[in-house]
Amino acid sequence: MQLLFKPKTAKSAEPTPVLVVAKDDTETSSGPLGALLKLKDLRLAAADLIKQVIPSAESKDDVSALPLPSPVPSTLFIVLDKAVASSSDLFALHLTTSASTVFLKGTDVKAYLESIAPSPEAVRVVDFAELKANAPAPQAKAAPKAAAKEQPKKAAKDDDLYEMAIQHKKEEDFPGWYTDVVVKGQLIDYYDISGCYILRPASYTIWQTIQEFFDGRIKKLGVQDCYFPMFVSQARLEREKDHIEGFAPEVAWVTKAGKSDLEEHIAIRPTSETVMYPYYAKWIKSHRDLPLKLNQWNSVVRWEFKNPQPFLRTREFLWQEGHTAFLTKAEADKEVTDILDLYRQVYEDYLAVPVIPGVKSENEKFAGADYTTTVEGFIPTTGRGIQGGTSHHLGQNFSKMFEINVEDPKATQADREAGKDTKVNVYQNSWGLSTRTIGVMVMTHGDDQGLVFPPKVALTQVVVVPVGLSKGEGKNQPIYDACQKLADELSAAGIRATADLREGYTPGWKFNDWEMRGVPLRLELGPRDIAAGTTLAVRRYDNFKESYPLEGIAKTVEGKLEDIQKALFDRALDKFNASVRPVTQWKDIVPTLDAKCAVVIPWCEDPQCEDDIKERSKQEAMKGQDEDSKAPSAGAKSLCIPFDQDRFGKFPEGENQKCVQCDKKAKRWALFGRSY
């Protein structure tokens, strides 16, 4: 028997669930157990909490200790029946759902639970028979009291509304808030493999919109789409050890087929350079075969061992990866910046997220690249930077390794007769953008009510909600018809609109639902609105309300959506600019970081100095505290060297301008900060 209980807590408090693993015939009385654990009013957990604690569970019948994430959340109490913990008998436990069962010795169950718990002490072994015997006797019943006046009952929908609402505040508990909004806002659902997530239509629409824009633009640059297999032989993956070294701990391997071990292990691609470039060498035989410009829309697997986070740190994610080859460096350099500007447009024009384009430091550039360019975002709520997308110039590093070369078109017959090597290696680029874009958008615009969608990427741009409804069958049909007609008119004009005609839900419940899902604009339509020829419009991002005439409504809404898109970007840009501060003295760096800001500093660009900045800022920020290996670093790392140096004021040139960390001459402004 495995049960999940939920104690009574304050509405604003995070639940502290209790998982009980006991023999089927053990009486697990919740009253004495709650008293032992000092938890009030233990009750069986509802389906949503079960799903949160055990992602693979579809119902209470699927509750099991085996699919728990490792390590389990520190808020979870694990209670193990002493009759199980000390027994060498076999016990049946569900593997992932009630449809699959395994048998383990009781002592092995105890050892397993202790292995996934934050500490062995986190598993509480309880003698339920003794607990029952020591429980206080029930009090004698008092004389019956006069019947109290019956209080009006809350509508069931009130409880639903609380469960549906975002439980965490963005400023107070950002990780809890983020998890809340991506799940309750219907962007993702949890899968039964840790670090893997289901992208629901609202999030996949964002990715499709990005794909449509970006794919159209790169095709104008001469890029063609292709697809290479996801499997990589061990020999091919290890051919470029320097490049793959950074990915080595994250590579997932296929080692079996059925019950048989494979002779050679097969990797699942973490990136595709070593997959694609042998074929570039095969296909590029002459300078006339250049440039070769290919792009893949695919998924890659990087078996992250850190705490996974939807969209930001996942074991499988969707991305595009472009791989191009050119005869000259100048051609390749131009493409690097062309692609980076498209990434900037994705963030700023579609997601309404400001970014800083720049070049990565030597320490932070892509392994095997001559240089890496990037668009860097920043999340003011957490004070951390986040890499948005990268475009790398690989130089001739990979073409030398994979022998991608052509006859130099400038070589003469005399050169050949003289025995000169007339082969030249091609210049290569690679560039990629992933579904991390969605997470950055959520963190930038979301609020305590839920998601806030920029109209350009919203699955639903406008929702029409009927109001002023009456009781009685058929009385509301004219209102429903008017709402559907309004939604159809907007849809015919190319606006993604829907009418919420769900029965059994109040308008207030629907308002909260669509606010949490981030729909940019809500139109309310009732009898008075219909009579007046107007509709009440409510903007999601600031809750501003105004009436629109129904005549010419499509054109009006189209303009308002454009205004919302711009307003979201402008608001985010103001916060972004206020959070990026020029600093010219070391003493101001850590206080600025602690104020949830990034710093722009005069920097010498020396790799050792970069390491020193990271370590020194971490030590000063920690001030002797023990470092939490699971927490993001408190040190400042190089985010990029911005292309637009004038954005931060005139650089203080001259021999007297020193790097803020060392005595070397500073070269440029560099953006440093804490990061994801």
Q: Where are the regions a protein language model picked out?
A:
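NTP/phosphate- and nucleic-acid-binding module
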Residues: M1-Y676
